[in-house]
Amino acid sequence: MAFINSAAEDEVQFEGIKRRLRSSGITKEAVTSLGAGETLEDEFDIASTSDLASGGPVSIRSHGFVPIVVDGKITGYIPYKSNDLTVNVDGGKAAKVTKALSQLTRRTEVTDCKGDAESSLTTALSNAAKLANQAAEAAESGDESKFEEYFKTTDQQTRTTVAERLRAVAKEAGSTSGGSTTYHCSDPYGYCEPNVLAYTLPSKNEIANCDIYYSELPPLAQKCHAQDQATTTLHEFTHAPGVYQPGTEDLGYGYDAATQLSAQDALNNADSYALYANAIELKC
């Protein structure tokens, strides 16, 4: 995950999408093999996902976890942390860069939920509300050691913040006629690449499910730390700042990576909330 700060040390808003990936059944196009000593280079234009029109110096850094995939399943994670890179941005040129999500402003119609997808999402929203409320209660006054397992502290302020965010998720999931987000049963913008379960556009407070959300996930997991429709929906709601500010990031996917985070990062990690809600539900 990359973070950009202005000269005033304010974090520049990310205007791209945040995807949740499945943890098993991962197809080959999503995996890169590196031999000993090999490196991989990639390029991305930060002006396409952040408003840098004001120009001037900005600092860029990245940290998180790289998943290790064996036979299509995530089996572990390697942590990474970059150095801080300071660059001077030409605001005029940055303003002319085509935005990655510019087509969103031209949207005129979104297909409504229908049939099996509508039924599945309705159930997922109900389950997400239930799980979020249970987890909120546990965060506020439940087992300290269980909370610390996922959020790396028993500090009361952190417990209160986690509980407040989860209650906000429960409220949003429980409202299908109002609320702060738009939830799409399908992919209106074309960002459901292979292995993507769902995604959120935080700058628009929009969430969309992908086909494998319905075909690969059960409504509720019967196994600790497994993915399901309810916790995927919960995960996505935490990304949306319209539900609770600030929206969460994707700093560690899955139990192994999420439980290696610092307390500060765990508080801002979407999967930490999904995993904790699953653990409370199944008494993990």
UniProtKB/Swiss-Prot annotation:
Subcellular localization(s) per the UniProt record: Secreted
Catalytic reaction annotation: Preferential cleavage of bonds with hydrophobic residues in P1'. Also 3-Asn-|-Gln-4 and 8-Gly-|-Ser-9 bonds in insulin B chain
GO BP field: proteolysis
Principal localisation: secreted
Keywords: Cleavage on pair of basic residues, Disulfide bond, Hydrolase, Metal-binding, Metalloprotease, Protease, Secreted, Signal, Zinc, Zymogen
Keyword match Disulfide bond: yes
Gene Ontology cellular component annotations, sorted alphabetically: extracellular region
InterPro entries: Fungal_M35_metalloproteases, MetalloPept_cat_dom_sf, Peptidase_M35
Domain of life of the source: Eukaryota
Residues involved in Zn(2+) binding: 235, 239, 250
Entry EC number(s): 3.4.24.39
S-S pairs: 113-185, 192-210
Active site: residue positions: 236
Cofactor: Zn(2+)
Function: Secreted metalloproteinase that allows assimilation of proteinaceous substrates. Shows high activities on basic nuclear substrates such as histone and protamine.
Family (UniProt): Belongs to the peptidase M35 family.
Protein name as annotated: Neutral protease 2 homolog AFLA_119780
Source species: Aspergillus flavus (strain ATCC 200026 / FGSC A1120 / IAM 13836 / NRRL 3357 / JCM 12722 / SRRC 167)
